[in-house]
Amino acid sequence: MIRIILFLLTNLAVMLTFSLILAVTGIQSESIYGLLIMSSLFGFSGSILSLIMSKWIALRSVNGRIINHPSNETESWLIDTIRQQSIKKNIIMPQIAIYEAADINAFATGARRNAALIAISTGLLENMTRSEAEAVIAHEISHVSNGDMITMTLVQGVVNTFVIFISRIISQALSSLLSSNRNENSEDEKDSFLFFLISTFLEIIFGVLASIITMWFSRHREFYADASSAKLVGKEKMISALNRLKSSHEPQESDSIIAFCINGKSNSFIELFASHPSLEKRIQALKNKKYM
């Protein structure tokens, strides 16, 4: 995934944009410390931008509707449940949104644990029992209280930094080797373009490989959020909710937010790139109290 993660499209766009800037300005030829600083600046920019804009992006992607005042009994129950769980987790109550979707799903996002958003699909409200929905909400509240969105940003930023840094070190060596026999005065532009092509190619390749790290973290935070939900509302409720997800439609949420959903795309053709563990593994972990 994220698919290759809530972040990857923005991160990739930012990295490629800055790759062009660095190649044109010649920053790649500066000291290794300067390159590391610039790599850190550019590497974290995409992640931080994604985090800051996460609520806006999420609401736009699912066409969510913020619930400020309940219009029916279900919305009243939803607000009360989230308020009570927020108090137990000692966080400010997140904004609440409902979005139209056939699949049973929910997600949490936001730049700060006390300024978060929890969105619930209509499929969840229509197909889950109240106790199951309560467990899913507790799972999302746990993501918020654990600061998973912030941690994910830091992980992605560090990964991006090393992807840019290592790509440019290798690109500098390769482009120098390939252009060593050229006329220095006539081939400067070609050398710069060659460096840009090599570094861009390596950033894409290393970026995909580095997503294994972010996806590993994403899978483990799901286990811990399940365990935290079980502690908050009871293990049986969380297991029942996960079993209910087995009958859900394939998640329709966009790739930019699927990593933050309770019901993710765990059936990736390569498990290393999956943002969520399989439902069977999550249920077994709860039964074994592995992360509790």
UniProtKB/Swiss-Prot annotation:
It is an enzyme of class 3 (hydrolase). Pfam families: Peptidase_M48. It comes from the Bacteria. GO terms for molecular function: metalloendopeptidase activity; zinc ion binding. The active site is at E140. Zn(2+) binds at H139, H143, E222. One of its GO terms (cellular component) is plasma membrane. InterPro entries: HtpX_protease (IPR050083), Pept_M48_protease_HtpX (IPR022919), Peptidase_M48 (IPR001915). Its EC number is 3.4.24.-. The keyword Kinase does not apply. Keywords: Cell membrane, Hydrolase, Membrane, Metal-binding, Metalloprotease, Protease, Transmembrane, Transmembrane helix, Zinc. It is found in: Cell membrane. CDD domains: M48B_HtpX_like. Gene3D superfamilies: Metalloproteases ('zincins'), catalytic domain. The chain crosses the membrane at residues 4-24, 32-52, 150-170, 193-213. It is a multi-pass membrane protein. Its cofactor is Zn(2+). One of its GO terms (biological process) is proteolysis. Binds 1 zinc ion per subunit. Belongs to the peptidase M48B family. This is Protease HtpX. It comes from Buchnera aphidicola subsp. Schizaphis graminum (strain Sg). The gene is htpX.
